[in-house]
Amino acid sequence: MVTDGPAALAEFDRSGADIVLLDLMLPGMSGTDVYKQLRVRSSVPVIMVTARDSEIDKVVGLELGADDYVTKPYSARELIARIRAVLRRGGDDDSEISDGVLESGPLRMDVERHVVSVNGYAITLPLKEFDLLEYLMRNSGRVLTRGQLIDRVWGVDYVGDTKTLDVHVKRLRSKIEADPANPVHLVTVRGLGYKLES
């Protein structure tokens, strides 16, 4: 455990890590700057830790690419559960199979053939819905902000609002959820964005 940004980077360079818990409020160098430097060095999973409970801090952390966030004060049990979940996602990578097929819960997507099935039954998706679902499946279990989803699916030059995304999510839910009004797979994370649960 280190207590400032430069020391954190030096320790990472010296010893490496399987996962990093990164406090946004570090002396000497901001947590976001440390995160950017870590990303230059490695794709190690990062959980942002912050004393702030504001929505904007969570959004910034997730849009930077953090794997998860936890707000102080937190229990040891919560932190351990989050660490295990992030390591499980990163280590097993069970949402993607080497032959170009993605799987998450009841969903199966053959990216090359542009085929999607739910519980073994094929469904038809327009291109944007397919692209949206593909990105969600490649990040199964991870909170994705509206900004991340729009940039990835519609492009960084998109000038519309987030309603377009919400409409596409609603259409996707009507095709992949048993009860679209009460989704259990494509869920809303209030104030942040969406997450695909496996």
From Swiss-Prot:
SUPFAM superfamilies: C-terminal effector domain of the bipartite response regulators, CheY-like. Phosphorylated by SenX3. Member of the two-component regulatory system SenX3/RegX3. InterPro entries: CheY-like_superfamily, OmpR/PhoB-type_DNA-bd, Sig_transdc_resp-reg_C-effctor, Sig_transdc_resp-reg_receiver, WalR-like, WH-like_DNA-bd_sf. GO terms for molecular function: phosphorelay response regulator activity; transcription cis-regulatory region binding. Gene3D superfamilies: 3.40.50.2300, 6.10.250.690, Winged helix-like DNA-binding domain superfamily/Winged helix DNA-binding domain (1.10.10.10). The lineage of its organism: Bacteria, Bacillati, Actinomycetota, Actinomycetes, Mycobacteriales. The keyword Transcription applies. The modification 4-aspartylphosphate is found at D23. GO terms for cellular component: cytosol; protein-DNA complex. One of its GO terms (biological process) is regulation of DNA-templated transcription. The keyword Hydrolase does not apply. Residues 1-87 form the Response regulatory domain. Residues 99-198 bind DNA. This is Sensory transduction protein RegX3. It comes from Mycobacterium leprae (strain TN). Keywords: DNA-binding, Phosphoprotein, Transcription, Transcription regulation, Two-component regulatory system.
